[in-house]
């Protein structure tokens, strides 16, 4: 059977695989699809207004062998500048920072407000980026195709910009694109750096994102088209998409994302004869198990945890070189356009609901959700047979995270308090927009202290960190005293969810997991929970 009422769509990722890294040499092997498989993905025959299709002679030969993308940095910059020169509603910008190797990261504002300079307006704010991973060319090409479509249809552009303003970064990771690799130039994965915030480039782009303060966002990727289950099956979806699912996002925002937005994206994909399904990871191939992706540790969570609607777009493309590129770009464009169109068609409802939910989130006494698990069921899932190209409904064990089952909750504290010695923790929280107060008179009072009872050290380093996993704690009440300069993080703020997922040690991507706050069995966790009404 097919589940769509309770599932979202995106990419197939095989967990537990750690690739070896070399500087500027991390391309992936190209998969040469059998003709019977390729027949499932015909050219859509539509006009696309992005550089690879407007200027086909500019596409390098290396795109065909999977060692380059289709659009150079210079052409991307020229394309964006050209659009801005002929459209008063687009402003081309170069930030005051660069990539790790000094490449420009151009971005554009879209607004019909005269003299718009990126400051907040009373309209819906939308954020879009592509090419977080440099070997996923369908991402930035889809973003540029969206801009090109606006340029080519003045009536549509006017309708969209009457109700929304945009910040768009087509190419988040220009170093990765230059080497056609997933990673930053340093070998860090950009989409695994949103919690630990180890790279300056991540912090710089996040600062733009915090300042923009979007209500709706789209993060544009491609997923791997590799054989599965003893080289018998391939993923079948042109595009997979998923709303960011952390349970600490306001339930009304999650309901809107998983209801109206999801349904409209699915309808748009159907209208373009594109296959689609939820974004899943594959923790096991024997038996075949799929889990809906939870993006706490593996994606840009800025908008969702700031109480907004955030969608992940994944098109079938990694390892396919230039195969089906028009179809891949169309799939990505369709998802972007559907999110945008749904937002602007329902702008008043979306804006009001999100702003109201943000205000409620800052004042609620609801419990916080620290960990969750999927609702596991047996079902079938469509795959393509490598043997003959037919689509098969394959039995799978499916982990449904829409919504997930909560398995660890905790009362919302009045605040977290910790020593001024942990300035790095305060800095990383502030980078996400969380307000962190410095207590000039220090702190003395009763707190909830967490004693570490279980903490497992990973046997493999990930990006230089041997993570501490499976953390368990016991809580007790005690009095603590901190001198002047201690930090106070109130839970009465609408970005508090960023603090929850980082400061509660058991959370999947907490600072304790990343050893930003190192812990071992027997330690008292150095961040204390102040019970409500204690200040």
PLM regions and their residue ranges:
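M14 metallocarboxypeptidase catalytic domain recognition
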Residues: 2-6, 16-535
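Bacterial N-terminal signal peptides
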Residues: 10-12
């Amino acid at each position: 059977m097919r589940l769509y009422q309770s599932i979202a769509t995106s990419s197939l990722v095989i967990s537990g695989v750690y690739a070896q890294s070399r500087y500027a040499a991390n391309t992936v092997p190209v998969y040469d699809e059998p003709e019977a498989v390729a027949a499932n993905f015909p050219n859509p025959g539509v006009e696309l207004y992005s550089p690879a299709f407007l200027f086909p002679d500019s596409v390098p030969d290396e795109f065909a062998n999977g060692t380059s993308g289709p659009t150079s940095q210079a052409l991307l910059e020229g394309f964006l500048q050209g659009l801005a020169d002929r459209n008063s509603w687009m402003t081309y910008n170069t930030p005051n920072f660069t990539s790790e190797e000094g490449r420009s990261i151009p971005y554009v504002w879209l607004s019909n407000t005269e003299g718009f300079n990126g400051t907040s307006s009373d309209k819906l704010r939308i954020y879009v980026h592509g090419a977080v991973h440099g070997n996923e060319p369908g991402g930035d090409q889809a973003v540029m195709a969206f801009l090109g479509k606006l340029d080519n249809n003045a009536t549509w552009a006017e309708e969209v910009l009457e109700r929304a303003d945009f910040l768009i970064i087509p190419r988040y990771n220009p170093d990765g694109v230059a080497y056609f690799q997933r990673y930053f130039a340093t070998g860090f994965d950009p989409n695994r750096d949103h919690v630990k915030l180890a790279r300056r480039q991540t912090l710089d782009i996040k600062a733009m994102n915090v300042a923009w303060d979007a209500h709706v966002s789209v993060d544009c990727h491609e997923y791997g088209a590799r054989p599965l289950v003893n080289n018998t099956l391939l993923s079948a979806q042109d595009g997979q998409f998923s709303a960011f699912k952390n349970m600490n996002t306001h339930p009304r925002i999650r309901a809107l994302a998983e209801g109206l937005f999801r349904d409209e994206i699915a309808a748009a994909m159907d209208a373009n004869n594109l296959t689609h399904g939820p974004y899943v990871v594959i923790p096991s191939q024997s038996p075949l198990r799929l889990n809906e992706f939870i993006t706490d540790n593996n994606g840009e969570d800025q908008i969702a945890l700031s109480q907004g609607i955030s969608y992940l777009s994944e098109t079938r493309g990694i390892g396919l070189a230039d195969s089906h590129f028009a179809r891949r770009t169309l799939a990505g464009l369709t998802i972007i356009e559907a999110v945008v169109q749904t937002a602007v068609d329902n702008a008043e409802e979306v804006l009001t609901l999100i702003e109201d939910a943000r205000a409620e989130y800052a004042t609620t006494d609801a419990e916080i959700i620290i960990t969750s698990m999927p609702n596991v069921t047996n079902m079938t899932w469509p795959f393509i047979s490598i043997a003959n190209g037919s689509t098969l409904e394959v039995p799978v064990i499916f982990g449904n995270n829409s919504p997930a089952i909560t398995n660890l909750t905790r009362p919302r504290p009045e605040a977290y308090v910790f020593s001024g010695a942990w300035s790095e923790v305060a800095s990383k929280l502030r980078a996400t927009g969380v307000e962190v107060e410095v207590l000039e008179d220090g702190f003395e009072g009763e707190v909830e202290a967490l004693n570490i009872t279980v903490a497992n050290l990973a046997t493999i380093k990930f990006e230089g960190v041997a993570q501490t996993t499976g953390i368990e704690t016991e809580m007790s009440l005690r009095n603590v005293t901190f001198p002047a300069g201690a930090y106070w993080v109130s839970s009465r703020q609408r970005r508090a969810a960023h603090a929850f997922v980082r400061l509660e040690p058991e959370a999947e991507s907490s600072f304790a997991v990343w050893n930003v706050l190192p812990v071992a069995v027997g330690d008292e966790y150095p961040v204390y929970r102040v019970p409500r009404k204690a200040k």
